[in-house]
């Protein structure tokens, strides 16, 4: 729940006009995507029944160069014993081209669910960026 408030906070702050730096000073951005099939506004992750989890890689493009720290989260978590586990790694760093990658993994219990993935960061000028996408976990085989 704390993560969700954090992400909403990034969105609210990122959309406000209180930052004195003009938008011309900022060449950065954020777009997250996947190579999964895109159907009706969501990416489709085909669950593999032969694995405990089915994995895919998500991509982020910032156009902001090396060493931007991106934070990731989802609107779902999975409980293992007493611990809540995210469906996505919580952080990644951009390469020299401003690109980053992160692993998303779903358990069988998520078949039929549409998971919303959030990614955000703040650039060197104090601008906040946030993007999201949806992944539907399906079992069509």
Task: Report each predicted region and the residues it spans.
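Short, surface-exposed loop/turn segments at beta-strand-coil junctions that are enriched for proline
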Residues: 106-111
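Low-complexity "stalk/linker" and mucin-like segments enriched in Ser/Thr/Pro/Ala/Gly
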Residues: 29-45, 67-102
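Solvent-exposed, conformationally flexible loop/turn segments
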Residues: 40-55, 61
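C-terminal edge beta-strand
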Residues: 131-138
């Amino acid at each position: 729940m704390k993560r969700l408030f954090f992400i909403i906070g990034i969105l609210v702050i990122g959309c406000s006009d209180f930052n004195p730096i003009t938008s011309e000073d900022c060449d950065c951005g954020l777009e997250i995507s996947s190579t999964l099939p895109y159907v009706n506004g969501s990416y489709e992750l085909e669950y593999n029944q032969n694995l405990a989890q089915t994995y895919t890689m998500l991509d982020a493009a910032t156009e902001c160069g090396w060493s931007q720290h991106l934070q990731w989260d989802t609107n779902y978590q999975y409980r293992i014993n007493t611990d809540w586990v995210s469906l996505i790694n919580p952080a990644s760093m951009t390469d020299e081209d401003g690109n980053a990658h992160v692993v998303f993994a779903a358990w069988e219990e998520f078949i039929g669910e549409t998971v919303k993935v959030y990614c955000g960061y703040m650039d060197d000028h104090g601008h906040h960026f946030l993007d999201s996408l949806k992944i539907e976990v399906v079992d069509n085989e």
